[in-house]
Amino acid sequence: MSVADLLARWRSNPQFMNKVAAWRIFPGSPAVYAPAPPSLHPALQGALAACGIQQLYVHQSEAVEAALRQENIVITTPTASGKTLCYNLPVLHTFLAEPAACALYLFPTKALAHDQIEELNRLAKAIDAVDPTARLAPSIAAYDGDTPMPQRSRIRKRARLLLTNPDMLHVSILPNHAQWADFLAGLRWVVLDEIHIYRGVFGSHVANVLRRLQRICRHYSATPRFICTSATIANPTQLAERLIEQRVHQIERSTAPRGEKHIILLNTPLVDAEKGVRRAAVLEAADLAAECIDAGLQTIVFGRSRVAAELLLTYLRAGLERRRSRPGQPFPAGNQAVPNQTFVTAEHVQGYRGGYLPAERRSIEAGLRSGLVRSVVATNALELGIDIGGLAAAIVCGYPGSIAATWQQFGRAGRTTDAAVAVLVATAGLLDQYVIRHSEFLFEQSPEHALIHPDNLMLLVDHVRCAVAELPFHRDEAFGASPYLADVLALLTEQGEVQRHGDRFFWSGLRHPAREMSLRSVGGEPVIIQQVEPAGEGERNAPCVIGEVDQVSAPLLVHDGAIYFHGGQSYQVQRLDLTALRADVTAVDVDYYTEAISDSEVKLLTCHAGRSAENSLTAWGDVAVHAQVIGYRKIKRTTHETLGVYPLDYTRRTLETSAYWCEITPAVQQELEVAGLWFDSVNDYGPNWVEQRAAVRARDRGRCAVCGAPEAPGRQHDVHHKIPFRLFGYVPGLNEAYLEANRLENLMLVCRGCHRRIETAGRYQTGLDGLAYLLSNLAPLYLMCDPGDLGVYVERGSPIGRAAVPDARTHAPRVFVYERVPAGLGFSAQLYDLHETLLNAALESVRSCPCVHGCPACVGPVLDDQPLQLQTKRLTLALLERLAA
C-alpha cells in the first residue's frame, strides 16, 4: 500500500478524522539549480560529475561561494536539503589548494559523525580517482570514544579531516594538543553541525570549548573559519555568533526538490470530557504505527522520554505478536534482506535511544538502511540528520518540547522526493494541547530562541581551569569575549589551583581538569546502570552494563524500586549507590511503571529586576532551591491509575540558581477572598491550635501515625489535618469554624517525611497551583528548552493583615519558575520579558479547555474528591482574569 492509499483510507474514516486537529499538505517542489562556482577546484568539479552531481542547488552554490570568500556561515535550510555538500565542498577545495590544510567536523552525537564519514569517503575517493596525487580518502577519520586505542595514534599522525564530537574535543584533543600540533597548525575549517542542539547547558559548555579551541589555534598560528548548520529556530544567526563569537552569514532559502508531505496533528479522543481525560497517547501512537507497518511503510515512532519510548516499543511489539499467527503485510518488493519473510513480527521493530551501547546503535542503523528493521521506536537520538534511508512515515508521540525538534522528527519521513506522512499525537498535557489548538506555532514563524550562557560562572570556572591547564594564561590575554577571566584567574590562584609567576598563570594540578567534568550536564560523571542476578539464585553471572544516566537525574529515574526500561524489557532497580555511581537492576515482568515524587522549597536571595502592575508584581533574580526525592508512585500501564505511593529518603540538595516569579498583590487576594475564590494563604489555625497540637502529640506518644518513627530530640513531628483546614471556612472574628477543623479526630501526628509525601500525593490543587502549572508548562514553548530544564514552586502567602513577620512582602504569595542549572542560563530573564505573553496564553488555555473542574490540558490533574469550593479551574481562571487585566 502506498502513502496515498493509507491517507485516503484515513480520510474516509470518520473516527480518524474526528481526532484530526489540523491536516496540512506541503506540496512537492522541483529543484532550482545553479552551476558550481567557477573558482571551485577542477578536480573537485570532476569528482562531483563522477558521483552523478552535474550541478548544485542554488543555496548550495551560494553557501560555497560565501565560504570561499572566507566568511563564517550558518545554513538553516530544511532537513534533506543537501546541507552536507555546503560544507564538504569548501573544505575539500581548501585541501586541494593547500596540502597542509586540515578541518574539524563537530557533531552533537557519535552516530552523526559515523554516518557522515561514508558520504565524505565517497566524494574523497572520487577526487582521488580524478587526481591520484590528492590522496584525500586515507586522511579522513572518525575519532570518538568508540575508536580503538591502537588506531588513535595513527589518526593523530595522518588525519587531515577529523569527524568527532564536542566531548572528545574537550576531554581528549585539547588537553593533548601537543600531540595534535600539525593538525591544529593546519586547521582551516571547523564545521558545527545541528547547532540548534547546542543550547542550554550543553550549548554553554560547547561555546567555552570553542573558546579553548580558538585559543589553542592562535598558539599554533591558525585562524579557522566556521560553517554551521541549524534547524529552523528564531535566532540561528544569533546562536551561531554566540557560539563562535564572530560574525556569520546566513543561508536560509532552500532550492532542493521535495516530495509531497502530509503533516497531521492528532488529538487523542476524550474518555471523560468532564475531567478532561483522554486516551493515552502511547496507545494511540502504537496503533497508528502498527497501521503504517501493516501498509508496508517503513516507520519511525518518537517518544519524548526513555520511559515513553520503551512503553511504545512494548505496546507495538505486543500488537505485532498478536497478529503473528495470521498473514501480514509482506516486505516491499525488491528487499533482499529477508527474502523468505512474509509478515512483519516483533523482531523487526527496534528501540533506539541514548543509553544504548554503541554496538546496539550501529546494528539498528544498518537494519534501517537495509530494510530489515521495519520500524524503530526512538527518542531524539534519531531526530538528527543520520542517513537511515527514506522512511515513509513518522509518528511523534507527544510534543517533543520544541518546535525545532518537532520539525526534525517530522523530517525523518520523506527524505526523498516520494510522498510521506508525519503525525503528531498530542498527549493530554497542557503544552501538547496548546500546540494542537494553535497550529500556527508549528506552521508559521517559530517563536523559539535557543539560549546559551557561556559566562555562567559555574561553567566558566571549569573551562578556565581546563584552558590554563592546556596553555598558561598571560595577564593581558582574553578568553573569548568573557569579561570575567581576570576574576576567575584570581579565584583559582587564591584556591591554589593556579600559580602566578610574573605576568603568567600556570596550572598547578596533577590531573587535567577536563576528565572531571561532563559537557552534557553539571552533574559530573554518569551513573552506570548494570544488570545483576537476583539474590539467592545460585551461580551469579558478572554484572552487565545496560545504560547510564546523569547524577542529577539518577534519583528521579533509577531510585530504589524504580522500573527502568531498556530494549522493551522492564528492569527493577534493586539499589542506587550515588557514591559508587551505580544502579543495580534485575529483569522483571510487571504491568506498571514508576514516577518519582520530589519535594522542594525556594528561598529568594536577590532580585535583579522587577516591575509592578495593578494586580501583580513580576521579577527575576537569584534563589536557593532545596529539593529532595521523597517517594515514588507505581502506575498501571494500561489504565495509568496510581497503584501505590512508597517512601524514599535521598539526601536533600541545594541549588543556587535564577528564577522568574509572579507575586499576587494584597488587593487581588482580598478581592478573591471576599468572593470565596482564594485559598492560598498560610492557614491561621485558630486560638486553640497550640493546645490541640500538644494533645495530639500526647495521644500519639510522639510517634508518626504513618511510619511509627519517634520524634528526634529537639525536633517535633508535624500535625496534619485529615480534612484540609481551609475547607472549614474559618474567618477570624467572624466564626469559630476552627473548633470543628481542629477536633482531635481530624488530626494526626506525622513525621516531616511522611507529611511531605501525604501533601504531595493528595493535596488539593488551588488557584496558585493552577497558575504554576500553566506558567511552567507554557514557558518551554518560547524558551526552546526542555520542560525538565525548569522547576516550579508555589509559596503560600500570609493572610491579609496577619503577616507572620513585620516584613509582609517576604511572605506574599508567589509562583517561582526556576532554572535547574547552577547560576542559571538566562531563561529567567527571558521569562520576565515574556510575562504578559505567558499570562495571556495561560488565560486562553483555561478558557478554551472543555473540562469542568480542571485537567492536564489546562490547570493540571485534580483529585476525584476535590471539594466544589476548591475547583482548581474556577480558582485559577478567577486569578488569571485579574492578573492579565
What are these regions (language model features)?
Residues 697-701, 743-747, 851:
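Short metal-coordination and nucleic-acid-contact micro-motifs, chiefly zinc-binding Cys/His arrays
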Residues 708-749, 758-760:
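Histidine-centered nuclease catalytic patch
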Residues 72-78, 126, 310, 733-739, ...:
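Compositionally biased, low-complexity linear motifs
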Residues 4, 8-51, 55-58, 62, ...:
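Helicase motor core with emphasis on the C-terminal RecA-like subdomain
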Residues 688-720, 751-753:
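Short cysteine-rich loop/turn motifs with clustered Cys
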Residues 225-228, 426, 468, 475-555, ...:
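Extended, highly charged accessory segments
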Residues 708, 755, 859-862:
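Cys/His-coordinated zinc-binding microdomains
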Residues 681-692, 727-737, 836-842:
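Short Cys/His-rich Zn2+-coordinating modules
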